């Protein structure tokens, strides 16, 4: 006989009914419901993060210092070496071309960094360049234009 989903049963003794506690003093677990008498554990659960009086972890760790500028502009970065690898023939390169090649995501600001070498002349038009990237593009006979 093949095993089917509706034939599966839990092993005997592996499942037991839940015990309903605190349902009257006549039953086995009435009144204090197996919690003993008085104390924090008898009344309710301890709060999240409570470590029995030990200084809790969130108070042992130092506070975060510093400042996060909410107006910071995030750029997606492309290195000069990546441009040389993706466009070996050179030519005019825009943000759309970089998106098409999978170098950056669309609808994001793009910045070209100066890591790597460039041998072909490229005319790059993106949002931002580093100084070293501009130098390398110009040295290869290309141009760097910021949007």
Swiss-Prot record:
PROSITE patterns: RIBOSOMAL_L15
Region annotation Disordered: where it falls in the sequence: 1-42
Domain of life according to the entry: Bacteria
Cell membrane listed as a keyword: no
One GO BP: translation
SS bond list: none
SUPFAM superfamilies according to UniProt: Ribosomal proteins L15p and L18e
InterPro entries noted in UniProt: Ribosomal_uL15, Ribosomal_uL15/eL18, Ribosomal_uL15/eL18_sf, Ribosomal_uL15_bac-type, Ribosomal_uL15_CS
Gene3D superfamilies for the chain: 3.100.10.10
GO terms of molecular function: rRNA binding; structural constituent of ribosome
Keywords on record: Ribonucleoprotein, Ribosomal protein, RNA-binding, rRNA-binding
GO cellular component, one term: cytosolic large ribosomal subunit
HAMAP family cross-referenced by the UniProt entry: Ribosomal_uL15
Record note on quaternary structure: Part of the 50S ribosomal subunit.
Similarity remark: Belongs to the universal ribosomal protein uL15 family.
NCBIfam families per record: rplO_bact
Function according to Swiss-Prot or TrEMBL: Binds to the 23S rRNA.
Record protein name field: Large ribosomal subunit protein uL15
């Amino acid at each position: 006989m093949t095993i089917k989903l509706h034939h599966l049963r839990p092993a005997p003794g592996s499942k037991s009914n839940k015990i309903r506690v605190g349902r009257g003093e006549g039953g086995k677990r009435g009144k204090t419901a197996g919690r003993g008498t008085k104390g924090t554990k008898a009344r309710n659960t301890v709060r999240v993060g409570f470590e029995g009086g030990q200084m809790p972890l969130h108070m042992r760790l130092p506070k975060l210092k510093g400042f996060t500028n909410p107006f910071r502009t995030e750029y997606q970065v492309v290195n000069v070496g990546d441009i040389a690898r993706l466009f070996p023939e050179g030519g005019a390169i825009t943000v759309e071309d970089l998106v098409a090649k999978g170098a950056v995501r669309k609808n994001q600001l793009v910045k070209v960094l100066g890591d790597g070498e460039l041998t072909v002349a490229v005319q790059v038009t993106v949002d931002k360049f580093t100084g070293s990237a501009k130098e390398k593009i110009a040295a290869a006979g290309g141009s760097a234009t910021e949007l």
